Amino acid sequence: MSFSDLARQTQFIDGVGQADLVASGKVSALELLDAAIERTTELNPPINAINITWFEHAREIAKKFKSNSKQKFGGVPFILKDLGAPYAGQHMSNGNIALKNAKYIAPVNSLLVQRFIDAGLIIFGRSNSPEFGSVPVTEPLAWGPTRNPWDLSKSSGGSSGGSAAAVAAGIVPMAHASDGGGSIRIPAACCGLIGLKTSQGRISLAPFGDEANFSVHFAVTRTVRDAAALLDEVHGPGVGDRVIAPTPTRPFKSEVGADPGKLRIGFIDHHLAGEKIDNECVQAVRDTCKLLESLGHSVENSWPSALDDKQASGKFTAMWSTNMSVGINALSLMLGRETTKDDVELMNWTMAEYAKSKTATDYAQAVYASMIYRRTMQQWWADGFDLLVTPTTAQLPLPIGTICNMPDDPLAALRIAGNWIPLTPPFNTSGQPAINVPLQWTKEGIPVGIQIVAAYGREDLLIRVASQLETAQPWAHRTPNL
């Protein structure tokens, strides 16, 4: 594979490092962008991470770019997930075939996208996403599957699988991602990245999203310092936000390298529903716990009692299905016509149809159940624990096609997904911050994700501990051979 010197030299430099190159005058924003475009052209075809590009639009922005001290990521190339991140004047499909064919153009920037721009990021495209982000793999009928850079026969995870694959391949140093049930942490686990799901209300979802829902938006990164520095640039409420996370006491970047002190940490290394969990995932948790103990922390075989509730996911079905129904109604507005069954993938259409059997009372009861679950979950931290360590996924990255539309059983994909990722959705319901840390790898060189969960509002503690682990057992030298 023939790269220019700059494209090769900057391939695995993180966002902070690339911004430093621009600020120092060693490279221009346009040169850095062209290097990323070159890598996109060479590396994207086998992995299908980036599905929409606007290279010339980005080049015009890069040509006019003038670095200043307020833009912490000035001139750094960046991509948006093709889901729920409107960028004024640019195409967005949400992984949906009808929006793709209609060439839907976003009318405004979301507040987060505007904050990315204000931070100096040069946005040149979108990353692949499953339709409406409804499954933890990235294989939409509209755009085809995104493949894992570490093993092209495997999934990159989802729903932010395109972003994770692009960062893992070194196309960009970090990329926008979102998480409604694990969709930042799961692809980060599959692709060997940092994936920080922030606290509910940490980052505004204005003007269209609802912070009181399960989903959050942020990014996947290669390094802890990128996650911390980017969070400094984009966190905070917007006008009218219903949920606002506690204000940090100092910049998140200050937590990188800070001593976390001696922490009380619980762990879980089995599947709560009694399903299969890969030996590599179990061993990854145990090895991580040993590492944490060697760093001076107290580790106990303990976890929140809420995780033992095997009926929990069923209690929230009315919410999930109703949210899908609302999403399909929104699709009609975006298309300017009524949505038909042919416009939507079968699983999502079936879920929305299921919502019609639910009443307002069913929905209200699900909201109430989620509130009780949230309080029960958070009580474990209130009782004296600082962190929880779990496998991010119960199995290694799945083969492409494992989770797909099945005409004879449209909702089978959700059951398969639930068995694969039992320990990420609970912390969307509880609203707590959680991070995937790429500490462990199989003998074959496949990443094995570790999830660390903190109390609500404690991203600072996650950053301290993740930074401590990154120093103790570095992963930056690990890169896929594409």
For every predicted segment, state its role:
Residues M1, I194-C289, A472-L482:
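A short helix-breaking turn/cap at a secondary-structure junction
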Residues F3-A7, F73-A98, G257-D269, A318-Q378, ...:
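Short helix-loop capping/hinge segments that flank enzyme active sites or metal/cofactor-binding pockets
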Residues A58-E60, N68-L141:
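Acidic/His- and Gly-rich active-site-bordering loop/insert found
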